[in-house]
């Protein structure tokens, strides 16, 4: 087996779905610095394809703004096929938390935007097998 493949196999795999390129870059840079393998999708179809194409997806981080499907619909679609997929939902601070929570599965936490690198790490940490995040 190629050494790069072994390294990737050992690293937590995270898919980030958001149409805002600056948010995606911030999340990817932050989580890659912590040793995670981070993949991005700017639309819902790509996010679904990524989650299914990886032999293991440790976490999906999605936003309300994902081209194609709204982020909540993306989460429900993925959960039908991957019921155990851990998901973290990024939401703009303007959204009503109770209204949003009612639409999400109960085990999907909300990371309120804007957030810092440390807030992102704290939100990701419970989902990553070896505590990276």
Per-segment meaning from a language model:
Residues 43, 70-73:
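Acidic catalytic/metal-coordinating carboxylates
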Residues 60, 110-111:
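Two-component signal transduction core modules
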Residues 90-91:
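Hydrophobic/aromatic residues positioned on beta-strands within the core alpha/beta folds
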């Amino acid at each position: 087996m190629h050494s790069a493949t072994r390294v990737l196999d050992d690293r937590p795999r995270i898919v980030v779905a958001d149409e805002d390129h600056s948010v995606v870059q911030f999340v990817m840079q932050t989580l890659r610095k912590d040793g995670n393998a981070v993949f991005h999708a700017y639309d819902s179809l790509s996010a679904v394809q990524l989650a299914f194409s990886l032999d293991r997806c440790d976490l999906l981080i999605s936003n309300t703004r994902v081209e194609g499907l709204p982020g909540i619909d993306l989460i429900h679609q993925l959960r039908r096929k991957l019921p155990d997929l851990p998901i973290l939902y990024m939401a703009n601070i303007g959204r009503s938390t109770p209204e949003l929570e009612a639409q999400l599965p109960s085990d999907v936490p909300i990371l309120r935007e804007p957030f810092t690198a440390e807030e992102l790490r704290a939100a990701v940490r419970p989902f990553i097998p070896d505590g990276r995040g």
